[in-house]
């Protein structure tokens, strides 16, 4: 969200062992470039530079990132889209609370949906994949009952909500 300060930059400035990373994926529309940036104490950056591979980011990716930084209109459009569809999806998932779903408040381009009912996150993930929706099941992050659902296009966001509703209703 615009104006949302998570305090990460201040933490990196005040602590020598903190690395803040950001991506150009969603807000700048450069997911395919796999490019981002980091901010940290000079000692951390120096250590990273000593071990990184040469040419670890393509020239095209670098040029795209620089151009993206100049595109305030695209960023504003992305923020507005994410805010609108994040709110819509939050309400849709909240409406499935009787099926044991709980949505964690988000200021990002995704929702964390916790499965606390009959259908597990693992089962929902598999069923959504069968319906053509790739979400992220989170056991490796200690959230065996969580799915990360990214805000997509209007069609994708409505589709994943409908698919999840069908899965939960079929389970009873």
Describe these PLM feature segments:
Residues 32, 107, 142-145:
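Short acidic/glycine-enriched loop/turn segments that link adjacent beta-strands
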Residues 82-83, 87, 96-131, 147, ...:
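Conserved PLP-binding catalytic core of the aspartate aminotransferase-like
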Residues 1-27:
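Active-site pre-lysine segment of PLP-dependent enzymes
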Residues 17-95, 102-104:
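PLP-dependent aminotransferase class I/II
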Residues 127-131, 136, 140-172:
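PLP-dependent enzyme catalytic core of the Aspartate aminotransferase-like
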Residues 7-14, 88-96, 127, 131, ...:
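Alpha-helical structural signal in soluble globular domains
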Residues 41, 70, 116-117, 152-154:
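Residue-level recognition of strand-loop junctions within catalytic nucleotide-signaling folds
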């Amino acid at each position: 969200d615009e104006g949302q300060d998570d305090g990460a930059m201040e933490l990196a400035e005040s602590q020598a062992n903190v690395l803040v990373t950001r991506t150009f994926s969603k807000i700048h529309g450069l997911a395919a470039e796999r490019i981002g940036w980091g901010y940290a104490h000079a000692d951390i950056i120096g250590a990273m530079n000593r071990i990184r591979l040469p040419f670890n980011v393509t020239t095209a990716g670098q040029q795209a990132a620089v151009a993206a930084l100049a595109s305030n209109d695209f960023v504003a459009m992305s923020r507005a889209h994410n805010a609108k569809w994040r709110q819509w999806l939050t309400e849709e998932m909240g409406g499935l609370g009787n099926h044991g779903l709980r949505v964690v408040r988000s200021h990002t381009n995704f929702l964390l949906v916790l499965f606390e009912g009959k259908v597990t996150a693992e089962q929902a993930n598999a069923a959504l994949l069968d319906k053509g929706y790739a979400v992220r099941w989170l056991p490796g992050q200690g959230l065996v009952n969580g799915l990360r659902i990214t805000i997509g296009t209007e069609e994708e966001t409505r589709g994943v909500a409908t698919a999840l509703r069908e899965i939960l209703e079929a389970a009873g």
